Amino acid sequence: MLKDLNKVRNIGIMAHIDAGKTTTTERILFYTGINRKVGETHDGGATTDWMEQEKERGITITSAAVTCFWDNNQVNIIDTPGHVDFTVEVERSLRVLDGAVAVFDGKEGVEPQSEQVWRQATKYDVPRICFVNKMDKLGADFYFTVGTIEDRLGAKPLVMQLPIGAEDNFDGVIDLLEMKALTWRGVTPIGTEATVEEIPAELADRAAEYREKLLETVAESDEELMEKYFGGEELSIAEIKAAIRKMVVNSEIYPVYCGTAYKNKGIQPLLDAVVDFLPSPLDLGETKGTDVKDPEKVLTRKPSDEEPLSALAFKIAAHPFFGKLTFVRLYSGKVEPGEQVLNSTKNKKERIGKLFQMHANKENPVEVAHAGNIYAFIGLKDTTTGDTLCDANAPIILESMDFPDPVIQVAIEPKTKSDQEKLGVAIQKLAEEDPTFTVHLDDESGQTVIGGMGELHLDVLVDRMKREFKVEANIGDPQVAYRETIRKPVESLSYTHKKQTGGSGQFAKVIITIEPYAPEADELEEGESAIYKFENAVTGGRVPREYIPSVDAGIQDAMQYGFLAGYPLVNVKATLEDGAYHDVDSSEMAFKLAGSQAFKEAVAKAKPVLLEPIMSVEITTPEEYMGEVIGDVNSRRGQIASMDDRAGAKLVKAKVPLSQMFGYVGDLRSKTQGRANYSMVFDSYAEVPANVAADVIAERNGTAS
């Protein structure tokens, strides 16, 4: 564990699925001495892919944290998933990183998920270097890939190396800093060092051209260097590196390297670049947070052991022996096992049991956790993703993370009673780990409904329930939660509930008026509902005071099952105007039944209509797919609200019925070759068009043809 923070790098490896980032990580681990045997994703042996599902699918689902060393520097690596369904893993790892390596496929260039991950990294202002991988692949084109970084990402790539050959003839790279060739000729077993050679004659002119571009970029970044360079003086390697580092830390440029991780070519220079150009915790300076008592007041913490403790929990993972592992980025201060800390987000004290640095799913115990590093804590009971841990005497709340709401939901039903109990435990554990996994009980269907970021996301979660928690369950389709309301008032409807069966009977008479009700939020008194209001207008004691709440309760009961299709009624105001009672036969139950029946009869005359949930949808798409995307939204009964530019793409905002959004994830991907993504949140309820309502009602009532 290094205490010199200048020599610490907290980095992520990010890319589109199949660009080779896990293989790149495996090679880094080998060259830094962590792995004696290298793992491959295609045979299920990769160190960072340690979940059963990852080994089977050959993709990275959870971001595993690994610590390694290179050239006397400590590198903490987070390997992030490239599949869009696991966007939460990318989001939370980027939040705690200081820098990242973006891996691109040398043939495909910038791919859809590369765009999305790049946007996420830009959101958190994470400095990046680029690695063009798979240069040995048929059709690999380094210059095309660099062009896509500029065009698709709107980024400024700084070419640091040129490839020597391509496809089967990829033999190495030209280092544009040292102006030397680094070659790995032929079959290169893992661990093969590069041979340093002169630049091949046929590439000398191109190398000189790109070296000139590099030096011009460096010179333009600094007035002193500009005078020196354009005055004909030579810039030293140290000056060039310092200028590049400064621009990288400020996210002004993105150095580009190349190689083939699988064939063991180009990894060592990439590691040198991580150390040379990506920032240390000290480069990024103070971390900002807010005062617990005054959210408007900004507090800062320097990356130092001497500062009060401030840390962010960015991931929860289940561990077979220790229970819950909480992955934490320590921004300031230090902490030891057994110490008590404050979870300022929840205002709860937590005691730290053990401290580990992780190597994928292996734990290395540490005695002290230092500022600027990433650790796994054991023993935290109440802490969840996004919570701040701090010194109780100097409380602070760090900026948390934004997690998108689930975009797909399915009903899940345990097969047996014993599965029912295990399902509850499984859901609780998985929800702790994953903020984008939601669960709720559908009051109308009685089903447990789980939500996530896509079909693969839910597949993996259901698979984990089976494997880890031994839960057998049936997965179904959820129903849209429709509602009903009324469109016209019905005045003074009289209903008498009368029952005589010997002895004391039942008697209650009510006269009610119902009307549509949709108040603005600022019109509501504290505790009032926006979807129902009851008013008592009875005078002269014609309905005794003690029976008034029973009428209200009866109406609320009746509202649970609407007139058209049995969906709950909303946005109704009911007024009790008059009534009558009997000294002996009236009771709370009689008035409750009278209120309920009167309301049902009134609703039947009040022009009842069906309402459906409308979602506010945001779609980010490359401009060339705008026509397809908008046409598709319109075909789903959607209404376009706005279209704006965003980070080299277009942002479409629309209102679309939820019933039309099932299967959208797949449709959007296929229409845009996977290059668009979307999020949606509930917006409001709106009336269902008559022709659609007729079908919904018929299906609900079992009369569909």
Swiss-Prot record:
Belongs to the TRAFAC class translation factor GTPase superfamily. Classic translation factor GTPase family. EF-G/EF-2 subfamily. GTP binds at residues 15-22, 79-83, 133-136. InterPro entries: EFG_II (IPR041095), EFG_III (IPR009022), EFG_III/V (IPR035647), EFG_IV (IPR047872), EFG_V (IPR035649), EFG_V-like (IPR000640), EFTu-like_2 (IPR004161), G_TR_CS (IPR031157). It is found in: Cytoplasm. This is Elongation factor G. GO terms for cellular component: cytoplasm. GO terms for biological process: ribosome disassembly. One of its GO terms (molecular function) is GTP binding. Catalyzes the GTP-dependent ribosomal translocation step during translation elongation. During this step, the ribosome changes from the pre-translocational (PRE) to the post-translocational (POST) state as the newly formed A-site-bound peptidyl-tRNA and P-site-bound deacylated tRNA move to the P and E sites, respectively. Catalyzes the coordinated movement of the two tRNA molecules, the mRNA and conformational changes in the ribosome. Keywords: Cytoplasm, Elongation factor, GTP-binding, Nucleotide-binding, Protein biosynthesis. Residues 6-282 form the tr-type G domain. NCBIfam families: EF-G, PRK12740.1-5, small_GTP. Its main location: cytoplasm.
